[in-house]
Design a protein with these regions (language model features):
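Catalytic-core helical/loop segments in enzymes performing group transfer/polymerization on anionic/lipid-linked
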Residues: 1-512
């Protein structure tokens, strides 16, 4: 995809979202929220590109007429009509809370940890201030793990897993909303004069019947139920700009008290990040955040320079994942080891691991540690990638120990879109971005003008690593460290007090 095509598609999606008569069903369509240039985000727009040769008459994999996938989806929907929703017993037992945190369950092992994977010790910090809170987890697990999560009872009473089913009448209403959104968008495609607007509206009409759209509307219904029971003053969730976040904030404002809606910019901010940089301003559908918490000085400045955010307030918060400073050996005193850091996308994991294995075959004197994202299921990962079952002698799969420990042992790292590379640079590691021909770059360190290098082939890696070892640029490494030190800050407790002050919540001073 070209820069021009990306910008045109993003603008067309925004026009559809802001058009008069936009419904909640339209806002729920994931396709209409252009997040960023990551390949996993761009894949859904492939039919809009010339090489796809998509025409009006071509059947889409998302339409009711393309029976195989949709028939299966319809069957699951019918089954869901007769399945009772999972219980909200914990919410009923809690009663009213001051702060509702919406986070994500990406691994069963994270359910019993004292701190949340995305928000760290936020609940503890609130409790120290005498502020009540509840942590609601969106269940992103699959198969047996997804079912087991609802039967586990060992986690704290102030945590709960959001139901993924709704009452039969609500399920039926959801699919009516999807069908209505499809009809409106097909009409918009028919009426459009611009070819991009026409193509985007047509594709969006197909996606109106996708599982993702229905899941977002189901999420809206479940969050409405939770907010009705807990009546929070503040609701906080992660924020990258996708449709599910809009569902959460709109649902929270639809019941009882109007809470302060907060988004936490927890992930890396790509050069072309779109949806997080603007408010939607959908007529009659209040789904923008009131506040965005930022994870560091650099992303804070980038969002502050985004005129599309309008009156949304930015508050510097930081990240619990920011590692404490450690005394580390100099780069030339470490073993010749390369840390491989994919993000949580399976396709990206495959690309980066295959590239690393190719490098390992060309440089047997260098050790490679393949470190999957914490959300990745290792059993499933091995089953999908045969190459991981029998690794070369100089390659290991890093599944134990912390990222800090791995960083302390490495000289170099391979990465693409992972924010873990920031932690690697803070540990003094030389970062190498793996690019591919024909794609928009999505380098997490795009704004870093020194120290990082771009690779197109394993041969590039061998050449660049040899040059780095022969003449390490310590000054560039120090400047890169300073950059990353500003990208992710330590948690700023005063940010919590600012939020509580905005809603007039009574607070006691936390113990020192």
């Amino acid at each position: 995809m070209t820069e021009q095509a990306y910008a045109a598609i993003a603008a067309a999606c925004d026009r559809l979202l802001r058009a008069p008569g936009t419904t909640l069903g339209r806002v729920a369509i994931p396709l209409l929220h252009v997040i960023n240039e990551h390949p996993s985000c761009l894949a859904q727009y492939a039919p809009l590109l010339p090489s796809s040769s998509v025409t009006r008459s071509r059947p889409s994999p998302f339409t009711l007429l393309n029976s195989a996938r949709v028939a299966a989806r319809a069957g699951r929907a019918v089954t869901r009509l007769f399945r009772p929703p999972e219980s909200l017993t914990r919410a009923r037992a809690l009663g009213q809370v001051d702060v509702l945190i919406i986070s994500h369950l990406v691994s069963l092992s994270l359910l019993d940890t004292p701190d949340d994977f995305y928000f760290g010790a936020l609940q503890s910090s609130l409790r120290e201030r005498g502020v009540t809170s509840a942590l609601v987890l969106l269940n992103h697990l699959h198969g047996e793990d997804a079912r087991r999560a609802y039967t586990m009872r060992s986690f704290p009473a102030t945590r709960m897993i959001l139901p993924r089913t709704v009452l039969p009448r609500v399920e039926a209403q959801i699919w009516r909303q999807c069908a209505a959104a499809r009809g409106y968008l097909r009409q918009a495609a028919h009426d459009a004069h611009d070819t991009v607007d026409q193509a985007v509206a047509k594709l969006a009409s197909d996606h109106a019947l996708s599982a993702g759209t229905a899941e977002n509307l189901r999420l809206h219904a479940c969050i409405s139920d939770v907010c009705h029971l807990l009546n929070p003053r503040i609701i906080i969730t992660t924020h990258e700009g996708d449709a599910s976040e809009r569902m959460i904030w709109h649902a929270a404002r639809s019941t009882g008290r109007r809470p302060l809606c907060v988004g936490y910019q927890h992930a890396r901010l790509f050069a072309r990040a779109h949806a997080i940089r603007r408010s939607l301003g959908v007529p009659g559908i209040d789904c923008d955040p009131d506040v965005i918490l930022t994870q560091g000085e650099i992303p804070h400045a980038a969002l502050a320079a985004s005129p599309g955010l309008g009156s949304i307030r930015l508050i510097a918060y930081g990240s619990h994942r920011r590692a404490e400073p450690m005394t580390l050996p100099a780069l030339d005193e470490r073993p010749r080891s390369c840390l491989v850091l994919p993000d949580g996308d399976d396709g990206e994991c495959s690309i980066l691991f295959e590239f690393a294995l190719a490098c390992a075959r060309r440089a047997p004197e260098i050790a490679f540690a393949l470190r999957p994202h914490p959300s990745v299921n290792l059993t499933a990962l091995r089953s999908r990638h045969n190459a991981l079952r029998q690794l070369p002698d100089n390659v290991t799969l890093s599944v134990s120990g912390t990222l800090d420990q791995e960083c302390a042992r490495a000289r170099y790292c391979l990465y693409r879109g992972s924010s873990a590379v920031i932690q690697a640079v803070l540990a003094g590691i030389k970062p190498f971005y793996v690019a591919r021909a024909g794609e928009l770059p999505f380098d997490s360190l795009f704004a870093l003008p020194y120290w990082r290098e771009t690779l197109m082939s394993p041969e590039d890696f061998v050449t660049r690593v040899s040059a780095t070892d022969a003449s390490p640029d310590q000054d560039a490494a120090r400047r890169a460290w300073a950059f990353c030190d500003r990208y992710v800050s330590r948690v700023r407790p005063a940010a919590i007090d600012e939020l509580l002050d905005m809603v007039g919540a009574p607070v006691r001073e936390p113990a020192q």
